[in-house]
Amino acid sequence: TLVLQAPDKKYVYVVGDFNDWTPKADYQLKQDGEYFWITLSGLIKGEEYAFQYLVDGSIYIADPYTDKVLDPWNDKNIESTTYPNLKPYPTGKAEGIVSVLQTGQTAYNWKVKSFERPAFDQLIVYEMLIRDFTEEHTFNAAKEKLEYLKNLGVNAIELMPVNEFEGNTSWGYNPSFYFAVDKYY
C-alpha cells in the first residue's frame, strides 16, 4: 500500500513501470482527508518498480518515504563497482527523481546479537563523512579502515548523514529522502 500526504490537493495518481507511466483510473489513489492511498496488486516479489506520484495532473514527485531513488542527474556518477546492477532511470517516461518500490525484501539479519556499547564517559567518537573518509567514497572502503580507527583508540563512529539529498556535494544535512541511503556510498 502506498500513502501520500497531500493537503489541499484534489487527486493523485501513481505512475510507473507497472502501468507504463500512464495515469489510469485503476491507479488513482483513494482520498482520506489529506491522505491519498492505493494498494497495488500483481507485483512480482523481489522485482524493483520505479514510480512517481502525479498530483493534480501536473506535479510529478517521488515518494518522500521511499528507501531508494533513481536520480537522472547524479546516478551516472555512481561506479558499477560501488552499486552493481543499479536499475536504469526510466528516461523518456519520467522527469526528476523517481521512487523505487520492491516487495518481498529480505529482512536484515543482525550478525552481532550481543553488542555492548562503551560506557558514556569512555566514548571516543569519530565523526565520519563516508564521502570524504577514503578515496573510494564507499561504505566498503570505510569498513576496511576500522582497524586503523580502533588503533587510534576510537570506539564509536558517528556517521554524518548517509541518506539521499539534492545534488552530490554536501555534508548531507539537506536531506530529501530520509530512508533512502545514498547509492554513491
Q: What residue ranges belong to the model's regions?
A:
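Basic K/R-rich, polyanion-interacting modules in nucleoproteins and related proteins
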Residues: 1-12, 61-122
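Aromatic-rich carbohydrate-binding modules that target alpha-glucans
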Residues: 3-48, 56-79
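Solvent-exposed loop/turn segments at secondary-structure junctions
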Residues: 20, 131-134, 163-166
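Short, solvent-exposed loop/turn and secondary-structure capping segments
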Residues: 25, 62-66, 136-141, 161, ...
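Conserved, mostly hydrophobic/aromatic
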Residues: 53, 128, 149, 159, ...
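An acidic-aromatic substrate-binding cleft motif
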Residues: 102-156
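Glycine-rich, aromatic-flanked loop segments that form ligand/cofactor-binding clefts
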Residues: 152-166
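Aromatic- and acidic-residue-enriched carbohydrate-binding clefts of CAZyme catalytic domains
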Residues: 165-185
